[in-house]
Amino acid sequence: MSTTTTSSKPEFPADAATKEYAASLDASDPLAGFREKFIIPSKANIASKKLAKPGLSSEPCIYFCGNSLGIQPKATAKYLEAQLDTWSSIGVSGHFTNVEDSPLREWQNLAEQAAESMSRVVGAAPEEVAAMGTLTMNLHLLLASFYRPTATKHKILMDWKAFPSDHYAIESHIAWHDLDPKESMVLIGPDEGTFEIPTEKILSYIDQHADDAALILLPGIQYYTGQLFDIQKITEYAQSRGLVVGWDLAHAYGNVHLKLHDWNVDFAAWCTYKYGNAGPGAMAGLFVHERHGRVDYREGEDSPKFRHRLTGWYGGDKSVRFKMDNNFKPIPGAGGYQISNPSAIDLASLCAALSVFDETSMAELRRKSVLMTAYLEHLLLKDTTDESRLFDIITPSEPAARGAQLSLLLRPGLLHKVAQRLQEAGIICDKREPGVVRVAPVPLYNTFTEVWTFVEQLKAALEE
């Protein structure tokens, strides 16, 4: 069985469908110890409607919903407690006091602590990343800076089934410029009867609209189908045709190996509460390539030249931030896109989640993820035919074209019954109307034995 690369598809032996084989994969998993760094919800707690403390039941659920919300790292409580203790003990001095026994920097530099760790997750220089805001808010800020339509180049290319918030954001920016979204939004979809959008089709749309498109914004991973787009190839080609290129990495952050700097991406934004495990509604992140974040002082210290953006005091250089002279001098890089003083509590939760990523690498996580999702696919398809299965896997089969998630399109009328049966069995995954179950085994805390158990329970639910 090949497990050395993420481009080749693992192959499995004849006994792969046994629980013993799944256990052998767990026994040889170099990342198995990371599961102990998380609080796994118990079966008893997920069935209860009362607020319960973790650990009341010894039997954990099977949590395959990290593509919607990751589970809580054990470090989160420690980091939040440290932040609350800092606030309660020294008050406003927490902005500038580096508390020696705290895992967190002083509040003034806390966003930089998060950005440094996030930069390693997305393959960027620390100066190219900012920890701030939430995903759609950050997309708005980035579009305000990078979408500069003209009379001839005004269209935005996007995927046909973008997450609604992305659709709303793009639509509103087009309307803000007194343009008609029906004319200026170009949706790229799959061919009739399919779900995957071939890279060649995206490139053909870029060619078709090279003269009238200003920008292309795509998801790194399509939230519904789980398709991973060829970020490097699409970025390079779109830029060669004169388009600005942005990426929504909500489902790619913490999931796949990214190299945003090397791929020359113009801008990107992501949330951190899915595979990033930073908590519901957690502080998000954005990327601005270094070539767009430069600040030019050749015309004098009081006349900095920089890329247009919506500005706020927290994006100002820290050396002059408190001078209050109304002369904005942005932090070079993505930090110059910050608007307001970020929540130290939210940053504590984010830094706690990132502390887990600091102990490994995206290359290692991706290696396990490729094997785990391939094993899931192998078990789902074993001893079935296209005609006999009550579901279709609409996620691409090639590892290079997907992340952790597999999207299962069930036959009409099965979704709610199957979802209920899985929940009763203590399995948490995600459903999307009209008939898709999204299953995402996460390499940080899920096991191969859980994959085996899930498939057994799913098949039992379908047989019922």
UniProtKB/Swiss-Prot annotation:
Q: SUPFAM superfamilies this protein is in?
A: PLP-dependent transferases
Which subcellular locations apply to this protein? Cytoplasm
One Gene Ontology cellular component: cytoplasm
One biological process term in Gene Ontology: anthranilate metabolic process
Q: What are the entry keywords?
A: Cytoplasm, Hydrolase, Pyridine nucleotide biosynthesis, Pyridoxal phosphate
InterPro entries named in the record: Aminotrans_V_dom, Kynureninase, PyrdxlP-dep_Trfase, PyrdxlP-dep_Trfase_major, PyrdxlP-dep_Trfase_small
From what superkingdom does this record's organism come? Eukaryota
**GO MF:** kynureninase activity; pyridoxal phosphate binding
Protein's UniProt name: Kynureninase 2
